[in-house]
Swiss-Prot record:
Enzyme class, first EC level, given as a word: hydrolase
Subunit field text: Monomer. Associates with 30S ribosomal subunit, binds 16S rRNA.
Record-level GO cellular component terms: cytoplasm
Species for this entry: Carboxydothermus hydrogenoformans (strain ATCC BAA-161 / DSM 6008 / Z-2901)
Taxonomy of the source species: Bacteria, Bacillati, Bacillota, Clostridia, Thermoanaerobacterales
Origin: domain of life: Bacteria
Reported function: One of several proteins that assist in the late maturation steps of the functional core of the 30S ribosomal subunit. Helps release RbfA from mature subunits. May play a role in the assembly of ribosomal proteins into the subunit. Circularly permuted GTPase that catalyzes slow GTP hydrolysis, GTPase activity is stimulated by the 30S ribosomal subunit.
Residues bound to GTP: 112-115, 162-170
Protein name in UniProt: Small ribosomal subunit biogenesis GTPase RsgA
Entries under Pfam families matching the protein: RsgA_GTPase, RsgA_N
InterPro entries to which the protein is assigned, alphabetical: G_CP_dom, NA-bd_OB-fold, P-loop_NTPase, Ribosome_biogen_GTPase_RsgA, RsgA_GTPase_dom, RsgA_N
Cofactor note: Binds 1 zinc ion per subunit.
Length: 290
């Protein structure tokens, strides 16, 4: 019987077969062969107690695997930020975008708390909407943008990530009535929320698909990559690199650089270029130290 591991907790694996959720142990061969079963894995189980307990017999091939958070077979990442309270960090948005694209994952960028939108955050939202295929404004405590978001989530395994206090748990409670996840209110003193998620669990969406509220991405170190690779994760840089004089242009000091021309005319905002330079320096430092 095939199923999906939706939770790995206290030595038990909870496997959703579509008809029931089985509490399972894994056969000894997995430990012997040092094979770790992750949330998101598709497995074959043998039923021990009808619709209740089973044993994991085999692990099906993975499409992908994330280390932090430890989860397999992810289709896309939902990056959740807020229009305000807390105001979005563009450095964190861009860092998470690069990390997701480097892992070959699709991205849905969500701006929550639309009721708190201000001119500055609206401008940010509009720019990202121009350069990315899936950007949506929502109010997790209301209806704004929820239909559009459910279309993106339908029949996919999605990982939820973003800073604390932006409404990730509130969003899951909105999408899955009865989930009753703890919510982290924003501290008025530091304008950040309390972390409320302890382990990785896939929550079944009523309209199809699964969503994980994760404790990560706790490690925000960029994955290993070549300097030239970085710009491929900045769509507006990647689209214009062919117009640069040098084919291997890094858009730093090279003459006749199309990206820097667009920066000067305001078509590329300074924050995007500054974040690109920050990441490029990180990659360069890593190359020097290796």
């Amino acid at each position: 019987m095939e199923g999906l591991v939706v939770k790995n907790y206290a030595g038990f694996y909870y496997v959703d077969t579509g008809k029931a959720i089985y509490m399972c142990k894994a056969r000894g061969k997995f430990k012997k062969d040092n094979i770790k079963i992750l949330t998101g894995d598709r497995v074959i189980i043998r039923e021990l107690v009808p619709n209740s307990e089973g044993v994991i017999e085999s692990l099906l091939p993975r499409k992908n695997e994330l280390i932090r958070p430890p989860i397999a077979n992810v289709d896309q990442v939902l990056l959740v930020f807020a229009f305000a309270d807390p105001f979005p960090s563009t450095e964190l948005i861009d860092r998470l975008l690069v990390m997701a694209y480097a892992l070959r994952l699709e991205v849905v960028l969500v701006f929550n708390k639309f009721d708190l939108v201000n001119p500055e955050s609206q401008k940010l939202f509009e720019y990202y909407k121009k350069i990315l295929p899936k950007v949506v404004a929502i109010t997790a405590r209301g209806d704004t943008g929820i239909d559009e978001l459910t279309d993106y989530l339908n029949q996919k395994i999605s990982v939820l990530a973003g800073p604390s206090g932006v409404g990730k748990s509130t969003l899951i409670n909105r999408l899955v009535p009865g989930a009753k996840l703890a919510t982290g209110e924003v501290s008025p003193k530091i304008k950040r929320g309390r972390h409320t998620t302890r382990h990785v669990e896939l929550i079944k969406l009523p309209f199809g698909g699964f969503i994980a509220d994760t404790p990560g991405f706790s490690n925000l170190t960029l994955p290993e990559m070549d300097k030239l690779e970085l710009q491929s994760y900045f769509p507006e840089f990647n689209q214009n690199r062919k117009y640069c004089y040098f084919p291997n242009c890094l858009h730093v000091k090279e003459p006749n650089c199309r990206v820097r021309e667009l920066l000067e005319t305001g078509e590329i905002p300074p924050f995007r270029y500054e974040n690109y330079l920050t990441f490029l320096e990180e990659i360069t430092s890593d190359e020097r130290s290796s």
